[in-house]
Amino acid sequence: MQRRDDPAARMSRSSGRSGSMDPSGAHPSVRQTPSRQPPLPHRSRGGGGGSRGGARASPATQPPPLLPPSATGPDATVGGPAPTPLLPPSATASVKMEPENKYLPELMAEKDSLDPSFTHAMQLLTAEIEKIQKGDSKKDDEENYLDLFSHKNMKLKERVLIPVKQYPKFNFVGKILGPQGNTIKRLQEETGAKISVLGKGSMRDKAKEEELRKGGDPKYAHLNMDLHVFIEVFGPPCEAYALMAHAMEEVKKFLVPDMMDDICQEQFLELSYLNGVPEPSRGRGVPVRGRGAAPPPPPVPRGRGVGPPRGALVRGTPVRGAITRGATVTRGVPPPPTVRGAPAPRARTAGIQRIPLPPPPAPETYEEYGYDDTYAEQSYEGYEGYYSQSQGDSEYYDYGHGEVQDSYEAYGQDDWNGTRPSLKAPPARPVKGAYREHPYGRY
């Protein structure tokens, strides 16, 4: 009853009616508002009209900001909280940067409040702070591309694990470093990479290593890692990856737990040389048989029918191509001239009496082929003994007596001169005098 007599409500009701019947059409959306939004169930008619009328009656009210489509739904109310307006991208970027800006001071404060005894936590916080200050976190999120045609150098780093857990008794560090560090120096020169041994157990003095590990110096932070080989390569992309592959392949050879391989043997020789111990003879500097060195003289063969060794030249024996095959040579006597038309003497005849020869002299080291070694087995005295026995049967000798001419043809094929395909016995012709005493009297 008091609300009906309330003058404020009466004035708002009258102003609402006058506004709805205004022909100028200043508020054309008044009748459409109830159709879009249903009235609240617990709000009184008078109060609601007064609020709506008061909102329409204020001419200085500004229009609401643009709202997204999700804000104008059936759940949106007139008297509810104002929705958040749309923001430009720059504003959203500033909102995202706020957590990063707060993250760095929080890390700094946490590092200051942390006790220095927490070594690992201090190292992690320091690394994270440096990463944010340098902006590496943004670089990690971005995609990296390699420009193979640019000559810009890049840096590659790899850590190769040393299998000390599988082979705890093998000294990998000593094998990689070598005597006085010469092995790893040569390895760096061959591969073109920077190679170093890092990690737990890389230092010889264990007490000093433990002290440096507890010191917290970032320079010795690698002592908290496992034992490994650190390889660094700097160069253009293609060359850098090729050098890294070559360096890893060479380092792999040093990670084989074998004390008898070539690497360890060379290190032992180098260590003995550095210590002043003479190098053991391994075929160097000792006279051995090879190119340019004469072989040791073999023992002199003894016995009948044993020829000189290969490559030896017996003094007085014929050289290849010097005399006609079948002729005999006496020591120190040149071969006699041959008579034209005379048949070649036969070297081997059935029933030749062989006289044992004295042992040959000591052979000389001379590189020559011993094709004519068999001619030294018989001498001229054998022929004299043979024909001296047969002189009692016949007083003279005829070339055609008891012989066949074909035998000369068969033997002539082995002539050394090679001028005639065959040697035929000439026909018997008279010689000065009826006959000779001996067919080989010219000897």
Curated annotation (Swiss-Prot):
Ubiquitously expressed in all tissue examined. Isoform 1 is expressed at lower levels in brain, skeletal muscle, and liver whereas isoform 3 is intensified in skeletal muscle and in liver. It comes from the Eukaryota. One of its GO terms (molecular function) is molecular function inhibitor activity. There is a cross-link at residues 96, 102, 139, 175, 432 (Glycyl lysine isopeptide (Lys-Gly) (interchain with G-Cter in SUMO2)). The modification Phosphothreonine is found at residues 33, 84, 183. The modification Asymmetric dimethylarginine is found at residues 45, 52, 304, 331. Residues 100-260 are annotated as: Involved in homodimerization. The modification Omega-N-methylarginine is found at residues 282, 284, 291, 310, 315, 320, 325, 331, 340. Residues 171-197 form the KH domain. One of its GO terms (cellular component) is nucleus. This is KH domain-containing, RNA-binding, signal transduction-associated protein 1. It comes from Homo sapiens (Human). The gene is KHDRBS1.
